[in-house]
Amino acid sequence: MKHLVIRNLGPLKEADVELKRINVIIGSQSSGKSCLLKTACYCTWVEKRIELTQTEDFFARDGNFLKELERFHKLKGYIKEDTFISYESDFMSFSFDNATKSFTFDWMEERWNYRRSKVTYIPAERNLVAAIPNWFQVKFADDNIRDFMADWETARQATANDLSVLNLDVSYHYDANTKSDKVQVADGVTLDFTNTSSGLQSVIPLFVHLSHITKIKHDRIESFANIQENSVLLSKLDEEDKRDVYTNYVHTHHCDIFLEEPEANLFPPTQSNLVEWLLSLTKGEQPNNLFVATHSPYILNTFLEKLDDDINLFFTDNQEGQMLVKSATESNLQEIYDYGVDAFFNIETLG
């Protein structure tokens, strides 16, 4: 299990949470949901970088830990003089205290049992790939939107055959000849992606992307950077450990999925169907991890209907003008499930 602590980041005064395989955060707008989601994603990525390079030096230098978080996740103006972040897993622990500009790091006992993951952040702005037909010609900042677009480019080009999208009687494919995205709708008509409904423009990018990355998990990608990382890794291993550890590090074993507002522009039954599909990605021999930020009672209720021991629900709580992240108790979960939409109008009572 992972333990994440955040203090004084954006609207968040404090978050102290245990992360499970499935995590969901709810709360009002501008209450810090995305701050928690983005920081959890970032710390998961930092863990991966340190494991693959076997050094924390980059993040310990020149305030790089917070600089990279601010740049990639568009958090300019959110960092405060006393911002503090700490993360602990079975493999390592690290923290950064902006008040003292200090980065601390320790390896944990399970250091060599780490298994490489594909860390993916799916932003609320994912429909840009449909709304702007020539998005690949537009210069974007090097942030999570650009990163998702790069992943989308890989996924779309790999989807030459029709891919059915949920239960919508809709399919998507990429036409390599015209370098365009095509969507076949219920009446058999094929549309350019940019001419489809807002709901399809929101759900197709995340569906195609996740369908792609969760099916290629075991592929080994040998970029120049990866070759350098692998050489460093091998130099640190005992001969008898090399085979098992090397396989865990160079092959992607699962995905860490961080998803903003899956409900965007979707009819409630479709929202529920999407959650059921997302949950299917967390099953199997090598389950993927999922963290969702949502405003939707339909999204939340579908998660609660499938509730198991490996899901955590968090909610933002306004206490005297300061936003805290709380973990829902069993009674909180039952109350939300029993009252459905009404619970969202009284979310402050959960605290």
Q: Predicted regions span which residues?
A:
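Phosphate-binding P-loop
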Residues: 14-20, 185-186, 248-253, 281-285
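ABC ATPase nucleotide-binding domain "signature" loop
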Residues: 264-266
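C-terminal lobe/lid and adjacent interdomain/linker elements of RecA-like ASCE P-loop ATPase modules
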Residues: 269-351
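Pre-Walker A-like glycine/lysine-rich segment at the N-terminus of P-loop NTPase domains
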Residues: 1-42
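Walker B catalytic acidic pair
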Residues: 260-262
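Phosphate-coordinating catalytic segments in nucleotide- and nucleic-acid-processing enzymes
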Residues: 40, 44-256, 319-338, 343-346, ...
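Residue-level preference for the first positions of well-ordered beta-strands
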Residues: 22-24, 119, 254-258, 289
